[in-house]
Amino acid sequence: MEDKNITVDKIVEICEGRLLSRGTVSTINAFCVDTRKINAKDMFVSLKSEKGEEIQHIKEALQKGAIGCITEKDVPEEIINKYKDRNIIKVKDIICSIQKLAIYKRKMYDIPVVAITGSVGKTSTKDIIANVLKQKFNVAKTEGNYNNHIGVPITILNWKENINAAVVEMGMNHLGEISVLTNIAKPTIAVITNIGTAHIGLLGSRENILKAKLEILEGLSKGGKIIINNDNDMLQNCDTKEYEKITYGIKNKSNYMAYDIERKDNCSEYKIKMDDKEEKIVVPQTGEHFIYNSLCAIAVGKTTGIKTNKIIEGIKTFKITEKRNETKEVNDLKIINDYYNASYDSMKAALEVLKNMKGNRKIAVLGDMLELGDYSENLHKKVGEEVAKNKIDILCTIGDLSKNIAKEAIKLGTKEVYQFKTNEECINKLKEVIKKKDCILLKASNRMNFGEISNYLQGENLWEEQN
Protein backbone atom coordinates (compact mmCIF):
# COMPACT_ATOMS: atom_id res chain seq x y z
CA MET A 1 0.00 0.00 0.00
CA GLU A 2 1.31 3.44 -0.96
CA ASP A 3 2.38 5.55 2.02
CA LYS A 4 -0.07 8.46 2.15
CA ASN A 5 1.24 10.09 5.32
CA ILE A 6 2.78 13.55 5.03
CA THR A 7 6.35 14.17 6.14
CA VAL A 8 7.57 17.14 8.12
CA ASP A 9 9.83 18.18 5.23
CA LYS A 10 6.86 18.08 2.84
CA ILE A 11 4.85 20.32 5.20
CA VAL A 12 7.70 22.83 5.26
CA GLU A 13 8.00 22.70 1.47
CA ILE A 14 4.28 23.04 0.66
CA CYS A 15 3.60 25.71 3.28
CA GLU A 16 6.83 27.60 2.54
CA GLY A 17 7.41 27.38 6.28
CA ARG A 18 10.41 27.44 8.57
CA LEU A 19 11.40 24.47 10.72
CA LEU A 20 12.17 25.88 14.19
CA SER A 21 12.77 22.45 15.68
CA ARG A 22 13.12 19.01 14.07
CA GLY A 23 11.60 16.22 16.12
CA THR A 24 12.34 12.52 16.30
CA VAL A 25 9.18 11.59 14.36
CA SER A 26 9.22 12.75 10.74
CA THR A 27 5.91 11.35 9.41
CA ILE A 28 2.49 12.74 10.36
CA ASN A 29 -0.62 10.59 10.31
CA ALA A 30 -3.12 12.87 12.10
CA PHE A 31 -3.74 16.60 12.46
CA CYS A 32 -5.72 18.27 15.26
CA VAL A 33 -6.90 21.85 15.88
CA ASP A 34 -8.38 21.33 19.36
CA THR A 35 -6.15 20.78 22.38
CA ARG A 36 -9.08 19.17 24.21
CA LYS A 37 -9.17 16.38 21.63
CA ILE A 38 -5.49 16.00 20.80
CA ASN A 39 -3.89 12.57 20.97
CA ALA A 40 -0.25 11.68 21.43
CA LYS A 41 1.54 11.69 18.05
CA ASP A 42 -0.93 14.17 16.46
CA MET A 43 0.39 17.26 14.72
CA PHE A 44 -1.22 20.29 16.39
CA VAL A 45 -2.47 23.02 14.05
CA SER A 46 -2.45 26.26 16.03
CA LEU A 47 -5.31 28.44 14.81
CA LYS A 48 -5.63 32.12 15.62
CA SER A 49 -7.18 32.68 19.05
CA GLU A 50 -9.51 35.60 19.75
CA LYS A 51 -7.95 35.85 23.20
CA GLY A 52 -4.38 35.55 21.92
CA GLU A 53 -3.85 32.16 23.57
CA GLU A 54 -1.97 30.47 20.73
CA ILE A 55 1.26 29.93 22.70
CA GLN A 56 -0.66 28.52 25.65
CA HIS A 57 -2.46 26.13 23.27
CA ILE A 58 0.87 25.03 21.77
CA LYS A 59 2.30 24.31 25.23
CA GLU A 60 -0.81 22.33 26.16
CA ALA A 61 -0.68 20.28 22.94
CA LEU A 62 3.01 19.46 23.39
CA GLN A 63 2.44 18.54 27.04
CA LYS A 64 -0.21 16.06 25.87
CA GLY A 65 2.25 14.38 23.52
CA ALA A 66 1.69 16.10 20.17
CA ILE A 67 4.62 15.35 17.86
CA GLY A 68 4.75 18.99 16.88
CA CYS A 69 2.84 22.09 15.88
CA ILE A 70 2.26 24.33 12.88
CA THR A 71 1.81 27.98 13.83
CA GLU A 72 1.97 31.57 12.61
CA LYS A 73 3.35 32.70 15.97
CA ASP A 74 6.93 33.15 17.10
CA VAL A 75 7.39 30.27 19.51
CA PRO A 76 9.45 31.22 22.61
CA GLU A 77 12.92 29.66 22.88
CA GLU A 78 12.02 28.10 26.23
CA ILE A 79 9.33 25.98 24.52
CA ILE A 80 11.62 25.04 21.63
CA ASN A 81 14.37 24.02 24.06
CA LYS A 82 11.99 22.09 26.30
CA TYR A 83 10.53 20.12 23.38
CA LYS A 84 13.61 19.53 21.21
CA ASP A 85 12.22 16.15 20.20
CA ARG A 86 9.13 17.76 18.57
CA ASN A 87 8.59 19.37 15.18
CA ILE A 88 7.81 23.07 15.38
CA ILE A 89 6.98 24.70 12.06
CA LYS A 90 6.32 28.40 11.52
CA VAL A 91 4.20 29.48 8.52
CA LYS A 92 2.95 32.82 7.23
CA ASP A 93 -0.75 31.89 6.98
CA ILE A 94 -2.11 28.94 8.95
CA ILE A 95 -5.42 28.64 7.02
CA CYS A 96 -3.73 28.85 3.63
CA SER A 97 -1.18 26.28 4.82
CA ILE A 98 -3.66 23.60 5.87
CA GLN A 99 -5.63 24.14 2.67
CA LYS A 100 -2.49 23.64 0.56
CA LEU A 101 -1.64 20.50 2.53
CA ALA A 102 -5.17 19.14 2.01
CA ILE A 103 -4.92 19.72 -1.75
CA TYR A 104 -1.64 17.77 -1.75
CA LYS A 105 -3.18 14.95 0.32
CA ARG A 106 -6.32 14.75 -1.86
CA LYS A 107 -4.18 14.07 -4.94
CA MET A 108 -2.99 10.81 -3.36
CA TYR A 109 -6.46 9.25 -3.55
CA ASP A 110 -8.18 8.02 -6.72
CA ILE A 111 -11.50 7.28 -5.02
CA PRO A 112 -15.18 8.30 -5.10
CA VAL A 113 -15.58 11.53 -3.13
CA VAL A 114 -19.11 12.73 -2.42
CA ALA A 115 -19.42 16.43 -1.55
CA ILE A 116 -22.68 17.54 0.08
CA THR A 117 -24.11 21.01 0.45
CA GLY A 118 -27.58 22.51 0.91
CA SER A 119 -29.50 24.85 3.18
CA VAL A 120 -30.64 22.08 5.53
CA GLY A 121 -30.14 18.35 5.84
CA LYS A 122 -26.41 18.23 5.03
CA THR A 123 -25.35 16.32 8.12
CA SER A 124 -28.15 13.75 8.16
CA THR A 125 -27.70 13.22 4.41
CA LYS A 126 -23.96 12.78 4.99
CA ASP A 127 -24.64 10.19 7.69
CA ILE A 128 -27.01 8.12 5.57
CA ILE A 129 -24.83 8.31 2.43
CA ALA A 130 -21.77 7.24 4.43
CA ASN A 131 -23.66 4.27 5.85
CA VAL A 132 -24.75 3.19 2.37
CA LEU A 133 -21.20 3.53 1.03
CA LYS A 134 -19.89 1.47 3.97
CA GLN A 135 -21.70 -1.53 2.53
CA LYS A 136 -19.01 -1.63 -0.18
CA PHE A 137 -16.23 0.79 0.73
CA ASN A 138 -13.97 1.76 3.61
CA VAL A 139 -15.40 5.25 4.11
CA ALA A 140 -14.08 8.48 5.60
CA LYS A 141 -16.68 11.13 6.40
CA THR A 142 -16.80 14.62 7.86
CA GLU A 143 -17.02 14.39 11.63
CA GLY A 144 -19.12 16.78 13.69
CA ASN A 145 -19.31 20.27 12.23
CA TYR A 146 -16.01 20.15 10.31
CA ASN A 147 -17.61 21.57 7.18
CA ASN A 148 -15.90 24.94 6.69
CA HIS A 149 -12.61 26.42 5.44
CA ILE A 150 -10.81 24.80 8.39
CA GLY A 151 -12.86 21.64 8.90
CA VAL A 152 -12.78 20.40 5.30
CA PRO A 153 -8.96 20.53 4.99
CA ILE A 154 -8.52 18.90 8.42
CA THR A 155 -11.00 16.18 7.42
CA ILE A 156 -8.98 15.38 4.29
CA LEU A 157 -5.64 15.58 6.10
CA ASN A 158 -6.93 12.90 8.49
CA TRP A 159 -7.94 10.43 5.79
CA LYS A 160 -6.38 7.04 6.56
CA GLU A 161 -4.29 5.17 4.01
CA ASN A 162 -6.84 2.39 3.55
CA ILE A 163 -9.98 4.43 2.76
CA ASN A 164 -11.46 4.00 -0.71
CA ALA A 165 -14.43 6.41 -0.53
CA ALA A 166 -15.16 9.68 1.26
CA VAL A 167 -18.11 11.90 2.12
CA VAL A 168 -17.36 15.58 2.67
CA GLU A 169 -19.90 18.05 4.02
CA MET A 170 -19.59 21.68 2.88
CA GLY A 171 -21.19 24.59 4.71
CA MET A 172 -21.16 28.28 3.93
CA ASN A 173 -22.69 31.61 4.83
CA HIS A 174 -21.11 33.77 2.11
CA LEU A 175 -20.54 33.58 -1.63
CA GLY A 176 -17.17 32.12 -2.58
CA GLU A 177 -16.80 29.76 0.38
CA ILE A 178 -18.05 26.58 -1.32
CA SER A 179 -15.77 27.40 -4.26
CA VAL A 180 -12.73 27.14 -1.99
CA LEU A 181 -13.91 23.89 -0.38
CA THR A 182 -14.82 22.08 -3.60
CA ASN A 183 -11.46 22.95 -5.15
CA ILE A 184 -9.78 21.36 -2.14
CA ALA A 185 -11.95 18.22 -2.00
CA LYS A 186 -12.26 17.71 -5.79
CA PRO A 187 -15.45 15.61 -5.53
CA THR A 188 -16.47 12.99 -8.09
CA ILE A 189 -20.12 13.32 -7.02
CA ALA A 190 -21.76 16.55 -5.87
CA VAL A 191 -25.01 16.62 -3.86
CA ILE A 192 -27.27 19.63 -3.25
CA THR A 193 -30.03 18.75 -0.78
CA ASN A 194 -32.13 21.91 -1.14
CA ILE A 195 -32.14 25.69 -1.34
CA GLY A 196 -33.91 27.19 1.66
CA THR A 197 -33.51 30.29 3.80
CA ALA A 198 -30.57 29.47 6.10
CA HIS A 199 -28.11 32.44 6.10
CA ILE A 200 -30.46 34.46 3.89
CA GLY A 201 -29.69 37.54 5.99
CA LEU A 202 -26.04 37.29 4.92
CA LEU A 203 -26.65 36.31 1.28
CA GLY A 204 -29.64 38.54 0.57
CA SER A 205 -31.86 36.18 -1.44
CA ARG A 206 -32.56 32.53 -2.24
CA GLU A 207 -31.14 33.21 -5.71
CA ASN A 208 -27.81 34.08 -4.10
CA ILE A 209 -28.02 30.99 -1.89
CA LEU A 210 -28.48 28.88 -5.05
CA LYS A 211 -25.53 30.64 -6.68
CA ALA A 212 -23.38 29.89 -3.62
CA LYS A 213 -24.39 26.22 -3.50
CA LEU A 214 -23.77 25.73 -7.23
CA GLU A 215 -20.15 26.73 -6.64
CA ILE A 216 -19.76 23.06 -5.72
CA LEU A 217 -19.55 22.34 -9.47
CA GLU A 218 -16.31 24.33 -9.76
CA GLY A 219 -14.28 21.51 -8.22
CA LEU A 220 -16.29 18.58 -9.57
CA SER A 221 -14.07 16.18 -11.49
CA LYS A 222 -14.41 15.69 -15.23
CA GLY A 223 -17.20 13.21 -15.83
CA GLY A 224 -18.55 13.82 -12.32
CA LYS A 225 -22.24 13.61 -11.42
CA ILE A 226 -24.49 16.10 -9.63
CA ILE A 227 -27.37 14.74 -7.56
CA ILE A 228 -30.20 17.14 -6.66
CA ASN A 229 -33.56 17.24 -4.92
CA ASN A 230 -35.98 17.65 -7.83
CA ASP A 231 -38.84 18.76 -5.56
CA ASN A 232 -36.97 21.91 -4.53
CA ASP A 233 -38.27 24.83 -6.56
CA MET A 234 -34.83 26.45 -6.93
CA LEU A 235 -33.03 23.26 -7.99
CA GLN A 236 -35.53 21.88 -10.53
CA ASN A 237 -34.24 23.84 -13.47
CA CYS A 238 -30.80 24.87 -12.25
CA ASP A 239 -27.89 24.92 -14.68
CA THR A 240 -25.53 22.03 -13.91
CA LYS A 241 -23.17 22.93 -16.77
CA GLU A 242 -21.70 19.90 -18.56
CA TYR A 243 -22.29 17.53 -15.66
CA GLU A 244 -24.83 14.71 -15.69
CA LYS A 245 -27.75 15.53 -13.39
CA ILE A 246 -29.35 12.76 -11.33
CA THR A 247 -32.61 13.64 -9.57
CA TYR A 248 -34.60 12.34 -6.62
CA GLY A 249 -37.99 13.33 -5.27
CA ILE A 250 -41.48 12.50 -4.08
CA LYS A 251 -43.65 14.91 -6.07
CA ASN A 252 -41.89 15.65 -9.35
CA LYS A 253 -40.80 13.00 -11.84
CA SER A 254 -37.25 12.02 -10.91
CA ASN A 255 -34.67 9.30 -11.48
CA TYR A 256 -35.35 8.02 -7.97
CA MET A 257 -38.91 8.50 -6.68
CA ALA A 258 -40.59 7.40 -3.46
CA TYR A 259 -44.24 6.33 -3.49
CA ASP A 260 -46.73 4.53 -1.21
CA ILE A 261 -45.17 6.31 1.76
CA GLU A 262 -46.12 5.12 5.25
CA ARG A 263 -45.13 7.15 8.31
CA LYS A 264 -44.84 5.18 11.53
CA ASP A 265 -43.96 6.18 15.08
CA ASN A 266 -40.23 5.46 14.79
CA CYS A 267 -39.63 5.02 11.07
CA SER A 268 -40.88 5.72 7.56
CA GLU A 269 -41.44 3.18 4.79
CA TYR A 270 -41.87 3.65 1.07
CA LYS A 271 -41.55 1.91 -2.25
CA ILE A 272 -39.20 2.74 -5.10
CA LYS A 273 -38.33 1.35 -8.50
CA MET A 274 -34.68 0.36 -8.85
CA ASP A 275 -33.41 -1.51 -11.91
CA ASP A 276 -37.05 -1.97 -13.04
CA LYS A 277 -37.89 -3.77 -9.80
CA GLU A 278 -40.06 -2.49 -6.95
CA GLU A 279 -38.24 -2.33 -3.62
CA LYS A 280 -39.37 -1.47 -0.08
CA ILE A 281 -37.24 1.01 1.87
CA VAL A 282 -37.29 1.39 5.66
CA VAL A 283 -35.87 4.65 7.04
CA PRO A 284 -35.20 4.46 10.82
CA GLN A 285 -36.30 8.07 11.36
CA THR A 286 -39.61 9.88 10.99
CA GLY A 287 -40.15 13.00 8.91
CA GLU A 288 -40.40 13.65 5.21
CA HIS A 289 -36.91 15.13 5.10
CA PHE A 290 -35.43 11.75 6.02
CA ILE A 291 -37.23 10.20 3.06
CA TYR A 292 -35.51 12.76 0.83
CA ASN A 293 -32.16 12.04 2.50
CA SER A 294 -32.56 8.31 1.87
CA LEU A 295 -33.50 8.90 -1.78
CA CYS A 296 -30.31 10.90 -2.16
CA ALA A 297 -28.34 8.03 -0.60
CA ILE A 298 -29.95 5.59 -3.05
CA ALA A 299 -28.84 7.81 -5.95
CA VAL A 300 -25.28 7.91 -4.58
CA GLY A 301 -25.29 4.16 -3.95
CA LYS A 302 -26.41 3.36 -7.47
CA THR A 303 -23.93 5.84 -8.96
CA THR A 304 -21.07 4.13 -7.10
CA GLY A 305 -22.13 0.60 -8.08
CA ILE A 306 -23.50 -0.67 -4.77
CA LYS A 307 -25.94 -3.57 -4.97
CA THR A 308 -29.61 -2.82 -4.25
CA ASN A 309 -29.83 -5.08 -1.19
CA LYS A 310 -26.75 -3.39 0.30
CA ILE A 311 -28.23 0.08 -0.30
CA ILE A 312 -31.43 -0.97 1.48
CA GLU A 313 -29.39 -2.30 4.41
CA GLY A 314 -27.31 0.88 4.61
CA ILE A 315 -30.44 3.03 4.88
CA LYS A 316 -32.10 0.75 7.41
CA THR A 317 -29.13 0.80 9.80
CA PHE A 318 -27.90 4.39 9.68
CA LYS A 319 -27.54 6.44 12.88
CA ILE A 320 -28.13 10.18 13.18
CA THR A 321 -25.42 12.59 14.42
CA GLU A 322 -25.98 13.72 18.02
CA LYS A 323 -28.06 16.91 18.54
CA ARG A 324 -29.54 16.69 15.03
CA ASN A 325 -33.06 15.28 15.08
CA GLU A 326 -31.91 12.76 17.67
CA THR A 327 -34.93 11.12 19.32
CA LYS A 328 -34.54 9.75 22.85
CA GLU A 329 -37.05 7.91 25.00
CA VAL A 330 -36.14 8.67 28.59
CA ASN A 331 -38.05 9.38 31.82
CA ASP A 332 -41.27 8.25 30.12
CA LEU A 333 -40.88 11.12 27.62
CA LYS A 334 -39.99 11.26 23.94
CA ILE A 335 -37.41 14.00 23.41
CA ILE A 336 -36.25 15.26 20.02
CA ASN A 337 -32.83 16.90 20.40
CA ASP A 338 -32.38 19.08 17.32
CA TYR A 339 -30.49 22.12 18.53
CA TYR A 340 -27.35 22.27 16.44
CA ASN A 341 -28.77 24.87 14.07
CA ALA A 342 -32.11 26.37 13.11
CA SER A 343 -33.65 27.80 9.96
CA TYR A 344 -37.25 28.07 8.82
CA ASP A 345 -36.89 24.92 6.70
CA SER A 346 -35.40 22.82 9.50
CA MET A 347 -37.95 24.15 12.01
CA LYS A 348 -40.76 23.18 9.63
CA ALA A 349 -39.32 19.67 9.20
CA ALA A 350 -38.82 19.19 12.95
CA LEU A 351 -42.39 20.27 13.74
CA GLU A 352 -43.67 17.74 11.22
CA VAL A 353 -41.69 15.01 13.00
CA LEU A 354 -43.17 16.12 16.34
CA LYS A 355 -46.72 16.11 14.94
CA ASN A 356 -46.38 12.52 13.72
CA MET A 357 -44.98 11.11 16.98
CA LYS A 358 -47.21 8.85 19.03
CA GLY A 359 -47.63 9.93 22.62
CA ASN A 360 -49.47 12.26 24.93
CA ARG A 361 -49.18 16.00 24.19
CA LYS A 362 -46.87 17.60 21.64
CA ILE A 363 -44.63 20.28 23.19
CA ALA A 364 -42.35 22.47 21.06
CA VAL A 365 -39.52 24.40 22.74
CA LEU A 366 -38.18 26.74 20.07
CA GLY A 367 -35.36 29.28 20.15
CA ASP A 368 -34.17 32.11 17.94
CA MET A 369 -33.14 31.53 14.34
CA LEU A 370 -30.01 33.55 13.57
CA GLU A 371 -28.41 35.14 10.48
CA LEU A 372 -31.76 35.96 8.83
CA GLY A 373 -31.29 39.74 8.59
CA ASP A 374 -34.30 41.60 7.17
CA TYR A 375 -36.12 38.28 6.70
CA SER A 376 -36.03 37.46 10.41
CA GLU A 377 -39.45 38.70 11.55
CA ASN A 378 -41.31 37.16 8.62
CA LEU A 379 -39.56 33.78 8.87
CA HIS A 380 -40.14 33.56 12.62
CA LYS A 381 -43.82 34.28 11.95
CA LYS A 382 -43.86 31.52 9.35
CA VAL A 383 -42.58 29.10 12.00
CA GLY A 384 -45.52 30.23 14.16
CA GLU A 385 -47.81 29.28 11.27
CA GLU A 386 -46.25 25.81 11.22
CA VAL A 387 -46.80 25.44 14.97
CA ALA A 388 -50.51 26.14 14.53
CA LYS A 389 -50.77 24.05 11.36
CA ASN A 390 -49.24 21.02 13.11
CA LYS A 391 -51.59 21.46 16.09
CA ILE A 392 -48.83 21.62 18.69
CA ASP A 393 -50.35 21.46 22.18
CA ILE A 394 -47.81 23.58 24.06
CA LEU A 395 -45.35 26.10 22.62
CA CYS A 396 -42.43 27.52 24.59
CA THR A 397 -40.22 30.12 22.92
CA ILE A 398 -36.91 31.44 24.21
CA GLY A 399 -35.25 34.65 23.02
CA ASP A 400 -36.28 38.00 21.57
CA LEU A 401 -36.54 36.90 17.93
CA SER A 402 -38.74 33.90 18.67
CA LYS A 403 -41.42 36.14 20.20
CA ASN A 404 -42.70 36.40 16.64
CA ILE A 405 -43.15 32.61 16.57
CA ALA A 406 -45.30 32.85 19.69
CA LYS A 407 -47.36 35.81 18.49
CA GLU A 408 -48.21 34.16 15.17
CA ALA A 409 -49.05 30.82 16.79
CA ILE A 410 -51.39 32.54 19.26
CA LYS A 411 -53.00 34.51 16.43
CA LEU A 412 -53.68 31.27 14.53
CA GLY A 413 -55.21 29.42 17.47
CA THR A 414 -52.46 27.75 19.52
CA LYS A 415 -53.88 27.86 23.04
CA GLU A 416 -50.98 27.22 25.42
CA VAL A 417 -48.02 29.47 24.59
CA TYR A 418 -45.21 30.64 26.88
CA GLN A 419 -42.44 33.13 26.11
CA PHE A 420 -39.13 33.24 27.99
CA LYS A 421 -35.86 35.16 27.96
CA THR A 422 -33.71 32.37 29.41
CA ASN A 423 -33.44 28.58 29.39
CA GLU A 424 -33.78 28.57 33.18
CA GLU A 425 -37.18 30.28 32.98
CA CYS A 426 -38.30 27.71 30.43
CA ILE A 427 -37.09 24.80 32.58
CA ASN A 428 -39.08 26.16 35.53
CA LYS A 429 -42.24 26.24 33.41
CA LEU A 430 -41.59 22.74 32.06
CA LYS A 431 -41.41 21.54 35.67
CA GLU A 432 -45.03 22.68 36.01
CA VAL A 433 -46.51 21.52 32.72
CA ILE A 434 -44.89 18.30 31.46
CA LYS A 435 -46.60 14.96 31.96
CA LYS A 436 -45.54 11.40 31.33
CA LYS A 437 -45.79 10.25 27.69
CA ASP A 438 -45.37 13.83 26.38
CA CYS A 439 -43.38 14.33 23.16
CA ILE A 440 -41.00 17.30 23.38
CA LEU A 441 -39.09 19.00 20.55
CA LEU A 442 -36.00 21.07 21.42
CA LYS A 443 -35.08 23.17 18.37
CA ALA A 444 -32.77 26.18 18.19
CA SER A 445 -29.40 27.42 17.00
CA ASN A 446 -26.45 25.85 18.83
CA ARG A 447 -25.51 29.02 20.69
CA MET A 448 -28.90 28.98 22.47
CA ASN A 449 -27.42 26.12 24.56
CA PHE A 450 -30.56 23.97 24.57
CA GLY A 451 -28.43 21.14 25.93
CA GLU A 452 -29.29 22.60 29.35
CA ILE A 453 -32.97 21.86 28.77
CA SER A 454 -32.27 18.42 27.34
CA ASN A 455 -30.11 17.53 30.35
CA TYR A 456 -32.89 18.61 32.70
CA LEU A 457 -35.48 16.47 30.90
CA GLN A 458 -33.14 13.47 31.00
CA GLY A 459 -32.21 13.94 34.67
CA GLU A 460 -32.54 11.01 37.06
CA ASN A 461 -34.83 12.87 39.47
CA LEU A 462 -37.07 14.56 36.89
CA TRP A 463 -40.43 13.48 38.26
CA GLU A 464 -39.38 14.03 41.88
CA GLU A 465 -38.67 17.68 41.03
CA GLN A 466 -42.05 18.30 39.38
CA ASN A 467 -44.12 21.02 41.03
How should each PLM-predicted stretch be described?
Residues 1-17, 40-43, 53, 188, ...:
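ATP-dependent carboxylate-amine ligase
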Residues 1-97, 257-259, 286, 357, ...:
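N-terminal leader/targeting and accessory segments in enzymes
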Residues 9-13, 96-225, 230, 234-243, ...:
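Phosphate-binding loop of NTP-binding sites
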Residues 32-33, 265-268, 285-296, 322-325, ...:
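Short glycine/threonine-rich catalytic loop with a Thr-x-Gly-x-Asp
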Residues 69-73, 92, 242-265, 282-288, ...:
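Beta-strand->loop->alpha-helix junctions that form or flank phosphate-binding loops
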Residues 72-74, 194, 230, 399, ...:
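Short secondary-structure boundary segments
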Residues 111-114, 191-197, 229, 294, ...:
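Short beta-strands and strand-loop turn motifs
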Residues 125-129, 262-278, 324-327:
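Acidic-glycine-rich active-site phosphate/pyrophosphate-binding loop
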